[in-house]
Amino acid sequence: MDNIATYVRANTKMKGNWSEVPEEIKDTFEKLGIPQAERTSLAGVGAQYDSELVYHNVRKEVAEQGVIYTDMESALTGEYADMVKEHFMKLVTPHDHKFAALHGAVWSGGSFVYVPKGVSVEIPLQSYFRLNAAGAGQFEHTLIIVDEGASLHFIEGCSAPKYNVANLHAGCVELYVGKNAKLRYSTIENWSKNMYNLNTKRAKVEEGGVIEWVSGSFGSHVSYLYPMSVLNGEGARSEFTGITFAGKGQNLDTGCKVVHNAPKTSSYVNTRSISKDGG
């Protein structure tokens, strides 16, 4: 871990038009079907390559509803800075564990989403994280705020090519679900088998709110992944559906945690794990 590079610069600035993305980066994401998915079934897409966002776009009709979907650096320095600073690293603090502390020190990239009160985003937003450099770490930060009575489905995808040296993924996800709001957070992680995946995810749910986690974990050499829901308001609810597959040479420790912090809260956990060839 001492040799992990904490920042690898992309060879391009972030683009809002897919045609402007450099060909070698575009080719990687096109093989994964990202542009096609954006055209047919997504309200917005963010694409991160190593430590930086290389593409970010949201449909005009979604933006006109007041939905904010932008990269974290722009959110922290632009007109949404006060909102971001109020929530940034408040659910996951640097004191939680050493990888949260590392994340807080070196984070880069990630997405910021805000859904205004009463707005329902009918089709999903997606961010895709590609770690392409050998011996590098990826430390993106995702911050989502779904205001009172609003709803959103957010999809996170992660992958990396295989190298003979270790890579590290120590991202952070903070989700705020307002009163009577609903958020579904879906993750597919198919890292290569040289990856150490030590991601921290946490949601805070207010009165009558719902958080739904959907998780598929299929790659990496080592994964430790336990999304946490803090049910902070009366009647708040958490649902977790997850599947994990560990093959030869893989050690995947996955599950979820729920803190029932208010009356009449409820949680449902449905997980399945498959081991093959000693995984």
Predicted regions and their residues:
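Short, Gly/Pro- and small/polar-rich lid/capping loops
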Residues: M1-V45
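Conserved beta-strand/loop scaffold segments within soluble protein domains that form the structured core
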Residues: E20, E24, K31-L32, Q36, ...
